[in-house]
């Protein structure tokens, strides 16, 4: 179908317009960061409905997350409503408003689940299945692995024995089990897991594939050998400039001849390389050279450095790639084949038994969703089934968001339900391979890359490719600097995609023309003589200084108004690769009293309150675990002192367990009687809880512990009590989650928690910070994807990449399979095999490529300004980075492949055009002035020494002052002693006032007077209300998604706060539009709409009170006030026994010079039989007379005007006071 011509004045760019209307073939939209892909996707769906007349439920829209799906469906629904209002007679649009609720806008997992629920009979499974939690799934999988390994121990096949010798230790099979588990997850990410496992042995058995692996290594080694040859030639050129270095030149000449032979004919002669020695030692330098001028001495050092680089590169190739002869490597592969085949057999056994266990428990996991869906959609020969054909007929288009994060199974599912081939298909894909950062979840970016390379701009003969490159998020300085970095860093060799004109970012946001350069801040660490802080702590303090500087000097631009506002805390985000720096940052921000929140999924199990409960549970499960038993005794619950524990141990120093020592101490006649009683009470508790745990689920045991010892109340009263309380409730809810699994009992729950900890499935502290809270945030790059912030501080750049997996004896790769090191069982020695060397090299390349993509995601989160924070031990290392080798317009491939961290590359790229000391051959071909505007960096590079950071000075001064004070006190200065005594003896003259609140709400005053009228002591009631804490109703007991009455009340007040008042009244349609507007502005949540009582609001809109307000001269909403109680109550002047009153009035309007206030009430009330409306009105007036009297008196006091009031009850109507 032809793309319609774009009219004049539309907001869409040409590429966006094509993305909205291109059809008739598969379409791949490469949408760069901030290019408006979600808006384009929504518009395409809308145009399919409006222009093409397609029903919304005949489109399949696949998103990456459930949140994205909900947001997408809401946007589409909103657009359909707008279109329906504009064309109320359109029957098609009316149908869409109904069908949107059945529309398939969901994650692929949700689609698969629906498919299974509708066609479970094909699978021969019970339709009443449930989805297992991840932790339950892992526990069951590990249980299965244990059982399968035990079965194979009974068989004792020779290959199995060799596997255990290689992959297990004398103490445990943990590594062996971990490899089996990894292989299982890799296999199920393929459409045919069994076939994938069967193919693992092929490279070990077939010489043709072994030859391919040798060629792969040869190609990889060429990068390093070529770089080595370049370094050798540079060394030769530098030595040629000097006198008295003939011997040096002779050595280098010999090396050049050797290298020429290795590279002869453009091929790498591996046998020659491995059969000869390279990197002969250079002669000592003569005194004549050492006494030469400074330039010559520098040249000598550079020459030696280049020769050293040449030698290290050759050594790397020989040690990493070709440490053994090719024939030996092939022989090793043959010997490894039985082990690899047997390992695959074990994994298939695990898969079979794991599936059997899941079926017996009637549970499915997310992998089952995908594979069962495939089973439904395909015949045995892999062709689409009849069901698949029916879906092909039903779905007129399939739209996939975040396509770069799909895997091979998901790709197969999509291919089963799409129609046609690429040149005439109905598959629309949107994504950005530069933001593919989920390889650990088995995402396969090669799917996107293959299509990107295959599809064409005009779509001739294949699919159509569209590049969305215009960025509407960031300032041009952020974009041009990002482009410059990636044009020199990313290509097909490292990064897996070419960063060219099609891939780069183009400026599209309407910012003003002010200059906002990117800031690269390099912190040079202070040594131990100048600071007691570690390097990480120094960086944390430095980041705080940057935040303070932003808050003091930077402003945020409002594109709509064209004006600036001051920066606030919530405008700033700190991005890091992981949460390793979180604790240091928390402390640094706390020291400066700056509100700070870590958006972390880590640290939950390290919180004091959570550790206490876990120690309690572990001690109950097994009191012979000393660390947990003693931890519980020392806790705030039992408060045993160190000297008491010492007394217990002294009497029984040889006991294996502390529990035994406690029992022995109680029975010892010499024991302290008071301590014995305390211990008896403790053991009684332990035994009581043990008995209780046998008959009750874990969550009830936790609940009993909380109630018995007032755990919630205690931790709620500490600093950060809100978060601590949430953490305790969170653990309680995790116990509920566990109880809903197929496991039971305290021991299994502890295993459940241990598995979460081991897998890094920490939950972070329970989140008590909302998206609009004014705090500085820290989050990982992964969690920031899709978000944007005015100020981004990208720190931790100097933290090395995590290459731990590359050191494992087994390397896994989706494309190539399994690379296992060779292990000589007799000699108990391990060697890299041909497969493990090749796959390890491939894995390292893929790892560095994904780390580059993480950098891209981080840089493109910034709207206004970007701060890059690097850290070095000393400034000398910066010179080495400036002199990294280049190849054309890129940092050399070998330099990129071996880069240890992001800073290594970023600093090298950005510093090359600014450093005067870099020789021309180490500079990029294009001078900075020749670079086009869209890629010309605007960056300030600052080298900061931590000794100069003001925070350090402050810390030092505080420390010095504290020491001086201590010394003065210790020296016994009489004046100081007298001053201290005076302060300690001081009697506060207003003790009684401390028992009264200095500030009270109107509601609190209302309760006070009601209590006094009933003859009850208000002080006692107030203390009870403040001190007593009860559980909030847990989410698991609430109806799914149902709000509580107080939450609905708040929601209704929020709607009323923004409700427009029009003389002609607003219609029901306009009311829906107005509420959708509140959702769009994030004033209320999207899912809150269903809880808004539309009929009650429409009743108010049709009321006389609404008309009166609409005709008022002035209207004020949500007016807060603070006033002296003495003025309101008209107390005598000088009466100091008063408080400040604070409150909030819902609405005030002015009519004919009189001020009226309105208070909305969502109260429900009981209409007793026979009561008239007048009687109910009187009852309601009496209920709120005190509160209303305070409102009236307060306003009269403040305004000095006549004030009247209304109460409006949504369930009753208007009452005038």
Swiss-Prot record:
Residues in domain UvrD-like helicase ATP-binding? 10-475
* UniProt-annotated binding residues for ATP: 31-38
Q: Which GO terms describe its biological process?
A: double-strand break repair via homologous recombination
| Keyword annotations from UniProtKB, A to Z | ATP-binding, DNA damage, DNA repair, DNA-binding, Exonuclease, Helicase, Hydrolase, Isomerase, Nuclease, Nucleotide-binding
Q: Do you know which Gene3D superfamilies this protein is assigned to?
A: 3.90.320.10, P-loop containing nucleotide triphosphate hydrolases, PCRA, domain 4
- Catalysed reactions, as listed in the record: Couples ATP hydrolysis with the unwinding of duplex DNA by translocating in the 3'-5' direction; ATP + H2O = ADP + phosphate + H(+)
Q: Where are the bilayer-spanning segments?
A: none
What does the function comment of this entry state? The heterodimer acts as both an ATP-dependent DNA helicase and an ATP-dependent, dual-direction single-stranded exonuclease. Recognizes the chi site generating a DNA molecule suitable for the initiation of homologous recombination. The AddA nuclease domain is required for chi fragment generation; this subunit has the helicase and 3' -> 5' nuclease activities.
Q: Which family does it belong to?
A: Belongs to the helicase family. AddA subfamily.
Its name, as the record gives it, is: ATP-dependent helicase/nuclease subunit A
Q: Which organism is it from?
A: Staphylococcus aureus (strain MSSA476)
């Amino acid at each position: 179908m032809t793309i319609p011509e774009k009219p004049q004045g539309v907001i869409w760019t040409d590429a966006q317009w094509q993305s909205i209307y291109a059809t008739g073939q598969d379409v791949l939209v490469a949408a760069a960061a901030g290019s408006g892909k979600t808006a384009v996707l929504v518009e395409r769906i809308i145009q399919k409905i409006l222009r093409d007349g397609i029903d919304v439920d005949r489109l399949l829209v696949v998103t990456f997350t459930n949140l994205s799906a909900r947001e997408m469906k809401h946007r589409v629904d909103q657009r359909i409503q707008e279109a329906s209002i504009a064309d109320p007679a359109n029957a098609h649009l009316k149908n869409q408003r109904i069908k949107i609720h059945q529309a398939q806008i969901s994650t692929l997992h949700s689609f698969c689940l629906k498919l299974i629920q509708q066609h479970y009979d094909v699978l021969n499974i019970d339709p009443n299945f449930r989805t297992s939690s991840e932790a339950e799934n892992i526990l069951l999988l590990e249980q299965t692995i244990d059982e399968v390994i035990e079965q194979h121990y009974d068989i004792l096949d020779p290959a199995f024995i060799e596997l255990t010798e290689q992959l297990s230790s004398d103490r445990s099979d943990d590594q062996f089990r971990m490899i089996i588990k990894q292989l299982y997850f890799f296999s199920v990410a393929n459409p045919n897991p069994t076939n994938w496992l069967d193919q693992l042995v092929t490279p070990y058995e077939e010489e043709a594939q072994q030859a391919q692996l040798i060629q792969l290594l040869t190609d990889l080694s060429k990068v390093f050998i070529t770089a080595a040859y370049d370094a050798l030639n540079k060394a030769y050129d530098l030595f040629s400039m000097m006198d008295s270095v003939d011997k040096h030149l002779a050595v280098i000449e010999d090396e050049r001849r050797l290298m020429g032979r290795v590279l002869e004919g453009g091929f790498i002669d591996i046998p020659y390389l491995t059969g000869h020695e390279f990197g002969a030692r250079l002669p000592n330098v003569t005194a004549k050279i050492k006494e030469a001028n400074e330039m010559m001495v520098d040249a000598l050092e550079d020459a030696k450095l280049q020769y050293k680089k040449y030698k290290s590169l050759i050594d790397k190739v020989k040690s990493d790639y070709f440490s053994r002869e090719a024939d030996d490597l092939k022989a090793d592969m043959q010997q490894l084949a039985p082990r690899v085949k047997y390992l695959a057999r074990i994994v298939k056994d695990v898969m079979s038994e794991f599936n059997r266990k899941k079926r017996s428990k009637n549970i499915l996991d997310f992998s089952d969703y995908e594979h069962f869906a495939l089973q439904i959609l395909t015949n045995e020969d892999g062709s689409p089934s009849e069901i698949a054909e029916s879906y092909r007929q039903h779905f007129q288009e399939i739209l996939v968001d975040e396509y770069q994060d799909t895997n091979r199974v998901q790709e197969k599912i999509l291919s089963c339900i799409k129609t046609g081939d690429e040149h005439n298909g109905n598959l629309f894909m949107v994504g950005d391979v530069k933001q593919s950062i989920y390889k650990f979840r088995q995402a396969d970016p090669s799917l996107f890359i293959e299509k990107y390379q295959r599809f064409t701009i005009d779509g001739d003969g294949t699919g159509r490719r569209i590049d969305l490159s215009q960025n509407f998020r960031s300032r041009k300085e952020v974009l041009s600097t990002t482009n410059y970095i990636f044009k020199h860093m990313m290509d097909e060799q490292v990064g897996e995609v070419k960063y060219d004109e099609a891939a780069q970012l183009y400026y599209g946001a309407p910012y003003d023309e002010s200059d906002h350069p990117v800031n690269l801040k390099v912190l040079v660490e202070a040594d131990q003589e100048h600071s007691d802080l570690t390097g990480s702590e120094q960086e944390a303090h430095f980041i705080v200084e940057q935040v303070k500087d932003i808050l003091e000097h930077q402003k945020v631009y409002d594109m709509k108004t064209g004006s600036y506002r001051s920066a606030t805390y919530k405008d700033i985000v700190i991005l890091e690769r992981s949460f390793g720096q979180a604790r240091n940052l928390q402390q640094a921000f706390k020291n400066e009293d700056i509100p700070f929140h870590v958006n972390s999924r880590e640290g939950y199990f390290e919180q004091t309150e959570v550790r206490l409960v876990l120690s309690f549970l572990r001690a109950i499960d097994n009191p012979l675990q000393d660390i947990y038993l003693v931890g519980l005794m020392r806790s705030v619950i039992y408060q045993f002192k160190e000297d008491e524990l010492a007394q217990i141990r002294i009497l029984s120093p040889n006991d294996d367990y502390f529990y035994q020592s406690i029992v022995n101490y109680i029975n010892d006649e010499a024991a302290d009687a008071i301590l014995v009683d305390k211990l008896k009470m403790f053991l009684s508790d332990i035994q009581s809880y043990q008995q209780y745990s046998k008959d009750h689920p874990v969550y009830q045991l936790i609940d009993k512990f909380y109630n018995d010892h007032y755990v919630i109340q205690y931790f709620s009263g500490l600093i950060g009590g809100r978060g601590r309380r949430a953490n305790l409730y969170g653990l309680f809810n995790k116990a509920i989650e566990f109880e809903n699994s197929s496991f039971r009992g305290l021991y299994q729950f502890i295993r459940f928690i241990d598995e979460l900890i081991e897998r890094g499935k920490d939950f972070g502290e329970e989140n008590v910070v909302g998206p609009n809270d004014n705090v500085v945030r820290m989050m990982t790059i992964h969690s920031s994807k899709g978000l944007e912030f005015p100020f981004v501080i990208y720190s931790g750049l100097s933290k090395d990449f995590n290459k731990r997996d590359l050191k494992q004896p087994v390397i896994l790769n989706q494309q190539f399979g399994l690379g296992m090191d060779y292990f000589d069982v007799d000699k108990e020695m391990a060697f890299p095999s041909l497969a493990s060397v090749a796959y390890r090299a491939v894995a390292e390349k893929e790892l560095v490529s994904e780390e580059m993509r993480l950098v891209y995601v981080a840089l493109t989160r910034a709207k206004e300004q970007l701060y890059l924070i690097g850290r070095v031990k000393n400034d000398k290392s910066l010179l080495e980075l400036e002199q990294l080798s280049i190849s054309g317009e890129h940092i050399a491939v070998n330099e990129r492949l071996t880069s240890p961290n992001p800073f290594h590359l970023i600093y090298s790229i950005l510093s090359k055009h600014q450093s005067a000391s870099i020789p021309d051959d180490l500079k990029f071909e294009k001078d900075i002035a020749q670079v086009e505007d869209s890629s010309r960096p605007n960056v300030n590079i600052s080298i900061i020494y931590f000794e100069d950071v003001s925070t350090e000075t402050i810390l030092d001064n505080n420390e010095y002052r504290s020491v001086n004070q201590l010394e003065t006190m210790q020296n016994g200065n009489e004046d100081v002693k007298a001053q201290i005594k005076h302060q300690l003896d001081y009697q506060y003259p207003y003790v009684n006032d401390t028992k009264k609140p200095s500030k009270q709400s109107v509601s609190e005053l209302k309760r006070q007077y009601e209590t006094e009228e009933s003859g009850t002591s208000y002080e006692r009631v107030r203390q009870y209300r403040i001190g007593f804490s009860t559980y909030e109703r847990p989410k698991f007991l609430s109806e799914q998604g149902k709000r509580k009455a107080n939450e609905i009340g708040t929601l209704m007040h929020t709607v009323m706060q923004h409700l427009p008042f029009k003389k002609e009244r607003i219609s029901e349609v306009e009311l829906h539009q107005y509420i959708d507007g509140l959702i769009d502005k994030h004033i209320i949540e999207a899912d809150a709409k269903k809880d808004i009582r539309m009929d009650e609001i429409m009743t108010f809109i049709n009321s006389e009170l609404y008309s009166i307000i609409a005709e008022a001269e002035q209207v004020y909403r949500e007016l807060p006030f603070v006033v002296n109680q003495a003025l309101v109550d008209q107390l005598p002047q000088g009466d100091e026994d008063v408080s400040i009153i604070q409150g909030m009035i819902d609405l005030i309007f002015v009519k004919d010079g009189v001020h009226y206030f309105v208070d909305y009430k969502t109260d429900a009330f009981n209409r007793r039989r026979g009561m008239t409306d007048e009687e109910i009105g009187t009852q309601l007036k009496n209920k709120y007379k005190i509160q209303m009297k305070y409102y009236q008196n307060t306003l009269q006091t403040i305004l000095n005007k006549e004030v009247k009031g209304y109460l409006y009850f949504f369930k009753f109507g208007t009452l005038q006071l």
